[in-house]
């Protein structure tokens, strides 16, 4: 929790104003932030200085692992995080690639589970990684990427957290996740949860011990209409101790994640939090 608050304070105190063309808003911005989550010690990085809707965050990462490309599928899992980008983004609404209501296009898991090859075929990057790790193989390129510049125009949004690189040392699994852009007040509390859960659940289904997850953010920012709430409300609150996350031990394979896992398979213990804060969202 301290590293999260340190980043928020750094942006407030040291950030520079940058105009964002896509949203038409200014952002207080810093470049490069590195966060670490020790999954082996159960240090679940859930924000306590406001209520965090952690089930929605986990539902989103599970949707990515399933390769979902439709906001309705994410809603069925338990999150509405894609409703606005799929249905309110003017550029996407006018795109010839949009298939209709709730369509997200080729982004995130839809790319990672079906990555286009130059010869016309596709690679299931996630399955390839799971197969390798289950056999104890680390080819130093176990990378789940959602980043495909040639497909940006075919999606409602470019991926923000776009790369997840798994590494093995003995039987301990590590993760390096890279994020090009982060809406810190709204997005980071979700992203921290997702990086932690991704390492924890991949370690579980491949029979490895989870180690540390390293989370790099390149452009970390607070939108101008979020600044007052962050500076004068959230940063004035005292954080509570971190809670712990329990994952159903019966989840043992990628097929389990794809077919029957629900948010009931995840449990939080000891979560104390302050009142929610309704930060504005920029489409």
Curated annotation (Swiss-Prot):
It is found in: Cytoplasm. (6R)-5,10-methylene-5,6,7,8-tetrahydrofolate binds at residues 183, 282. One of its GO terms (biological process) is methylation. Pfam families: Thymidylat_synt (PF00303). It comes from the Bacteria. The keyword Cytoplasm applies. Pathway: Pyrimidine metabolism; dTTP biosynthesis. Keywords: Cytoplasm, Methyltransferase, Nucleotide biosynthesis, Transferase. SUPFAM superfamilies: Thymidylate synthase/dCMP hydroxymethylase. It catalyses: dUMP + (6R)-5,10-methylene-5,6,7,8-tetrahydrofolate = 7,8-dihydrofolate + dTMP. GO terms for molecular function: thymidylate synthase activity. The active site is at residue 160. GO terms for cellular component: cytosol. Its EC number is 2.1.1.45. DUMP binds at residues 22, 180-183, 191, 221-223. Its main location: cytoplasm. InterPro entries: Thymidate_synth/dCMP_Mease, Thymidate_synth/dCMP_Mease_dom, Thymidate_synth/dCMP_Mease_sf, Thymidylate_synthase, Thymidylate_synthase_AS. Catalyzes the reductive methylation of 2'-deoxyuridine-5'-monophosphate (dUMP) to 2'-deoxythymidine-5'-monophosphate (dTMP) while utilizing 5,10-methylenetetrahydrofolate (mTHF) as the methyl donor and reductant in the reaction, yielding dihydrofolate (DHF) as a by-product. This enzymatic reaction provides an intracellular de novo source of dTMP, an essential precursor for DNA biosynthesis. Homodimer. PANTHER family: THYMIDYLATE SYNTHASE, THYMIDYLATE SYNTHASE 1. Belongs to the thymidylate synthase family. Bacterial-type ThyA subfamily. This is Thymidylate synthase. It comes from Marinomonas sp. (strain MWYL1).
